[in-house]
Amino acid sequence: MTHPVWIWQYEQWPHFCWNDSNIISLLARVRQQQGQLLGLMSSLGFDTQSHNTLEVMTEDVLRNAEIEGMMLNPDHVRSSVARHLGLDCAGMPEADHYTEGVVQVLMDAVQHADAPLTEERLFNWHAALFPTGRSGITAITVAAWRQGAEPMQVVSGAIGKEQVHYEAPPSERLPQEMAQFLRWINSEESIDPVLKAAIAHLWFVNIHPFDDGNGRLTRTITDMLLARADGSSQRFYSMSAAILRNKKGYYEILEYIGKHGMDITPWLIWFLETIEDAITTAQTRVQRVVQKTLFWQKHISTPLNERQVKIINRLWDGLDGKLNTSKWAKMTHTSSATALRDIQDLVQKGILRDSGEGGRNTNYVLHEHKSCPRCGAAFICQHENPAKCQCAGVKLSPATRAHLAAQYPNQCLCRKCLLEFSI
C-alpha cells in the first residue's frame, strides 16, 4: 500500500491521538483563566456585560472574515449584532443583507450552542454565507456537500506554479465523513469540552465538506463548542481575533498536521495557547472597562466640559498616538490656548498627568485608578513607570513573581494584596 500523504488517508482516521502529559497543565491553566474571566464578567452590571458582548461578537464576525481576506463594514456588523442582542440601535446604520446573514450564523451558533449540530443546520449556515450561490464570480454548490470528481485542494502561488498545501477527501466520501463527524459532535463524551472544540476544528477543516466557506464555518463550530464549554450564550473573548494575530502560525500548524499522521498533540498545544491569548486580551479589555466605570463613578460630581469628557473617553477607549496640546486642539476643534487650559484643569483635578517622556512637547496620560484583579479594590498604578509603581516597594521572591505574572498577566495587584506575598 502507498504511504499516506494526507491525514484522512491513514487507516486510523479519524481516531486522533495525543500525549496527555504535554497538554494537561496547559489545559488546566486555560480552564482556570476561563473561570476567572467568567467570574469577572458576572461581577459587572448588565449594561457593562452587554456592551462587552457587543464588542466581542462584533470583533469575532469581523476577524473570522478577515482571516479569509474579507473585509466587512464594522458599523454594519455592530448594528446587526446589537439588534440580535436586543440592544439600542438608535443612530446605527442598517446592516446590509449579506452582513445580516453572516451575523445570524454566529448568533445561531453561540446562542443555541447546546442545540444539536445537524446537516440541515450546517446547510443553513452555508446558505447565509453565500446568498447569491456564488463565491466571487464563480458559481458554487450551496447548502449541500461539494460534488464532482475535481480534487478539493488548498493551494497558493501563481498559476502554473501552485503549491498544494492540502488535499481533502473526495466528494463521494463526504456523506459518510460528515455523518461520523456530526455523531461525534452531538455525543456525550467524557472528553474536556475545550479539547472537543480543538478536535472539531481540526476534523472539520480537514474534511473540507463545502465548495467554499470551510474556514469560516470551522471557526463558527469552534465558537459554538467554546460557548458550550463556557456554559454561556455570550462570548467574552474572540478566538478568531487571536487566530488572526497569528494567522501564519495557524496555517502552518494546520498544514503540518494534515501531512503528519494522527498524533495531533502539536495542534492541541497551539489551540490552547491561542485560547490563552484570546482570554488574556479579553481580561485586559474587561479590566479597562471596569477601570473606566470606576473612574466615572468617582468623578460623577467633578465639573467637566464637553471637550474634556470627549477626550477622557477617547483615552479610556484607546487613543491612537500621544496626547498633547496640539492634538487636543485638533480633536476638539479649538484653539491651542483653550486646549492648554482644558489640560491644565484636568492635571489639577488629578485626572491627567505628565507622561514623563520629556521632549519638545509635553505628553499627557490618564492618572489611572485601576481595580486590583485579586480583590477588586481601586488603586493608582503607574506600571509604565516602574520606579513609581506600587509594585516597586514590595519585595517578592522570584517564584512568587513568576506565579503572580502567570495568574494575572500584564496586571498589577494593589499594595495590600502584594504585601500578603512579601518576603
Predicted feature residues:
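Short Cys/His-rich local motifs and their 1-3 flanking residues in nucleic-acid-associated proteins
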Residues: 377, 393, 419
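Short linker/helix segments within small regulatory modules
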Residues: 396-409
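Residues immediately within or flanking Cys/His clusters that coordinate Zn2+
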Residues: 369, 388, 411
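Short cysteine-rich clusters marking metal-coordination/redox-active sites
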Residues: 372-375, 414-417
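FIC/Doc superfamily catalytic core
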Residues: 1-368
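Short flanking/linker segments adjacent to small metal-binding domains or redox-active Cys/His motifs
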Residues: 417-423
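Short cysteine/histidine-rich zinc-coordinating motifs and their immediately flanking basic loops
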Residues: 384-390, 401-404
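Short, non-ligating residues that shape and space the ligands of small metal-coordination modules
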Residues: 381-382, 398, 423
